Amino acid sequence: MAASRSSSRISFAKIIEPLEVPDLLALQTQSFDWLIGSDAWAERVQEAIDSGRDDVPITSGLEEVFEEISPIEDFSGSMSLSFRDHRFEPPKYSVEECKDKDMTFSAPLFVTAEFTNNTTGEIKSQTVFMGDFPLMTPKGTFVINGTERVVVSQLVRSPGVYFERSLDKASDKDLYSCKVIPSRGAWLEFEIDKRDTVGVRIDRKRRQSVTVLLKALGWDEARILERFGDFPSMRITLEKDHTASQDDALLDIYRKLRPGEPPTRESAQTLLENLFFNPKRYDLAKVGRYKVNKKLTLEIAHDVGVLTEDDIVRTIEYVVKLHAGADPAEYEVDDIDHFGNRRLRTVGELIQNQVRLGLARMERVVRERMTTQDVEAITPQTLINIRPVVASIKEFFGTSQLSQFMDQTNPLAGLTHKRRLSALGPGGLSRERAGFEVRDVHPSHYGRMCPIETPEGPNIGLIGSLSTFARVNPFGFVETPYRKVVNGRVTDQIDYLTADEEDRHVKAQANTPLSPDGTFAEDRVLVRRKGGEVEFIPPDEVDYMDVSPRQMVSVATAMIPFLEHDDANRALMGSNMQRQSVPLLRSEAPLVGTGMEARAAKDAGDVVVCVQAGVVEDLSADYITVMHDDGTRRTYRLAKFRRSNQGTCINQKPIVFEGDRVEAGQVIADGPCTDNGEMALGKNLLVAFMPWEGHNYEDAIILSQRLVQDDVLSSIHIEEHEVDARDTKLGPEEITRDIPNVAEEVLADLDERGIIRIGAEVSPGDVLVGKVTPKGETELTPEERLLRAIFGEKAREVRDTSLKVPHGESGKVIGVRVFSREDGDELPPGVNELVRVYVAQKRKITDGDKLAGRHGNKGVIAKILPQEDMPFLEDGTPVDIVLNPHGVPRRMNIGQILETHLGWVAKTGWQVDAGTEDWKERLRGIGADSSTPGTNVATPVFDGAREEEITGLLDSTLPNRDGVQLIGSSGKATLFDGRTGEPYPYPVAVGYIYILKLLHLVDDKIHARSTGPYSMITQQPLGGKAQFGGQRFGEMEVWALEAYGAAYALQELLTIKSDDVVGRVKVYEAIVKGENIPEPGIPESFKVLIKEMQSLCLNVEVLSSDGVQIEMRDTDEDVFRAAEELGIDLSRREPSSVEEV
């Protein structure tokens, strides 16, 4: 059992980090705690108040929304309704029950509603039910209709004021513009054109002079000149402005905004008021007010969400000063891609916006009911309709682009999914419109968003991952920690800085050498300034220092050893492929790790963690009972062979024994892809880098048969099959063993209900659940009527609609769930019974499967060789895997070579002899000068084992059982050909590398079809494995046959094998009767083309070679006659789409 092995790693890290890795799920859990105002949030608020910090919002999300909407007044203001004190009842079902029964894990939300009659002063108070509110599980996910989902955080442009510079190509002048962007409401834009006039656009409408807006706000010409007279641009603008008074200006604005409507002073004044000065219509939000105050150096209170006259005047002043060439240190344009100008909408805020939307819809209903109902009879309950609120929350979780089906391939995939940052989604960017600048790596991403981990393809750069140490502040800006440096001495004080604050400081990197007293060891320190510029400066000018070398990368990237030796493109692939790794039968932690494995596994939430210290009292495969020190007991239930969202296997197993002492926070059971509490995504395999008979050309891989025999790379996959019995127009469907026209042996594994027994081996086409559906009643013959009279209903027509194992799938039945209306289960309307069957299959590794390392070195297995044919070492050990060395140099992922060498060192163990070389001193200093064989090592990113250390350790490895050191400082060994026993002419790089088996398995991709469904319109076979489609013989394939002159093969492919409906049946008939295959007819798609042209009023006729018109009939009697003889039902409509299949 794995528990016997220690999971401690020998680390090659030289830097002592002052800060622990924070809770990796805090991005999700803290945001949701704030939304619902949970106890955990209240504790954080209290702690922040006690220590004088303001980094925790003191009003919960739901409270904010209810405060915003209260009071709802009727149109006359005589009555109002307000909400306060929301609370949650305990959830009705547990997370596990919700997953089992396809329900949403939620808790009932209650709010105290107060109805006030303002004329009489009477107050009626009631507790109102506001619907079931989905709750977050402790793992940061939501269970919606039985499936786990994740809400991804969204990266959006922050509300605020932004200044831009652009070059006018004609006049070669710098033009300046500015946008005031609110959280909700109309945009206000200022711009200076090439004629030096200052213009304004209100709500994206036509441009007008900025002086018109100032006059509309009540300024006269004298006041404008007094404030802006020094700027030529404003004087020119004023000269060209023909409005004389405030009234003229207001009417002028009204005409531009509402062309065609008769303007009056009152309506114009109201319009302007509503656009920018009405809190109901315009809101900068707290973050917008913070950004505006900061940019324009104002001191307006944070709760003022509307624009003030001061805001507008200062913005105009800023633009004209920029245009006049003011001091760049004080006045500068903004970079929209800077992380000071992009903020995160986390889960809490996204759901809060949705609740706000629902309450706004409800508000309209309440107002209408206030006017229609009798004042005396009104109670809060009669006014409120919770439908819009419930619907908007449901809509968000069910259909929003940001609520996603959780990636559960392995624990790392889930963890990364929860830490994902997306610029897409409502209110964000779209793939098509996003340019290169938005997608690019920006200096302000440092320590906030990982520069490596992002998808390949159309979403590159739009979807990122939160860096390891980053956190989100109350405004939604991402902060990263730095160590404070005072007078050239590094302190233990940690400050979290936003990208804006960071720009004002000078930062040293984490690996800057320090003296024991915390001062810089060298007299010149390499630092980073604003915009990513680097230079050497004296130590006393440094403000901050990085807390850790892995501060800039995400969790997945921080799990790549020797990341510093890999090209970024390959590291990106490595980060992404770790998330596609399949949980294997027996997990094995990497020999060469980075020290991040244990933390990632624990925070991913797929292991069982002990809550309170105590002693293990009782345990089995299903549960662990711990007796706590205070005498209480707690039983931890383990998940056994559950199906994940991706069909991989979730299985937990204990790693402690009865009587063991366990501490709070200790891992007591491993989950999928974990080994002794560490993330274990693959296997350590003995690798040789050499070409082998051309079989590993172009990234192909050669494997040893041992990996198949010993189930080294075998994984379990579980498929769920579902069938329901519904009420149809002709009567109810029935789940039964009594299926018409089916042999008894087919039903051998079904029980008396018609459901397959657990443990049965099934293959494609086997019946899992027997089901019959009533057939349409036809006119009965007298004989049939007689039979009915004698035998009663028994002779009624039913057809077999049983659930069968799909093509290409097989395995063993491991579970059956039956839900029926009779037993009181909640089922959709019209469904009487629902049966789910779980089929598990063990997939051994096979040729065609995709394997990968952690450095983006991926390939497909081309050949599995018998163990005796594999190249072997001097002591007879055959290698497990042969990789092509050509895959390394041009891809520049040298990390895999260093991992190979260090893997060998870790596997064989080492003993460094006495000596004064630098590397020996360093290893002694960190306690890494000796180890036993099979010791796991950690080489953290940017702070790992150095090249000379690895060279030295290869020389210091322990000898094998024959006293021979197989590999020296070169890292290469003499290998022998397994087939001939001859040594290969050159030494070969051999060592241990961590190999992952990816979810791209050949069994899921391989597919073949004889006959199957055809498309309704073109009558051609459908495409794709899911539709049981055919292989497309495309344009280029046709050219190939044309080039060879294979005319008959081509004609056959384009007609009878595809869409010549008549010919298809005739060929079938000819084959059955043993006759020659007839001449092909006209393909259906040709007929469709003719019809389309005719629909465009083009008279198209088809003529034969001798000029006679060819008649194209839609049906052919001969076909139907032939089909009937052969028992083919041509009247049955083939499915025309994926849904129907």
Swiss-Prot record:
EC class of the enzyme, as a word: transferase
InterPro entries in the cross-refs: DNA-dir_RNA_pol_bsu_ext_1_sf (IPR042107), DNA-dir_RNA_pol_bsu_external_1 (IPR019462), DNA-dir_RNA_pol_su2 (IPR015712), DNA-dir_RNAP_su2_dom (IPR007120), DNA-dir_RNAP_su2_hyb_sf (IPR037033), RNA_pol_bsu_bac (IPR010243), RNA_pol_bsu_CS (IPR007121), RNA_pol_bsu_protrusion (IPR007644)
Lineage: Bacteria, Bacillati, Actinomycetota, Actinomycetes, Frankiales
Organism name: Frankia alni (strain DSM 45986 / CECT 9034 / ACN14a)
Gene name per UniProt: rpoB
HAMAP family listed in its UniProt record: RNApol_bact_RpoB
Gene Ontology cellular-component annotations: DNA-directed RNA polymerase complex
UniProt-listed PROSITE patterns: RNA_POL_BETA
Record-given protein name: DNA-directed RNA polymerase subunit beta
GO terms of molecular function: DNA binding; DNA-directed RNA polymerase activity; ribonucleoside binding
Keyword terms: DNA-directed RNA polymerase, Nucleotidyltransferase, Transcription, Transferase
PANTHER family: DNA-DIRECTED RNA POLYMERASE I SUBUNIT 2
Summary of the function given for this chain in its UniProt record: DNA-dependent RNA polymerase catalyzes the transcription of DNA into RNA using the four ribonucleoside triphosphates as substrates.
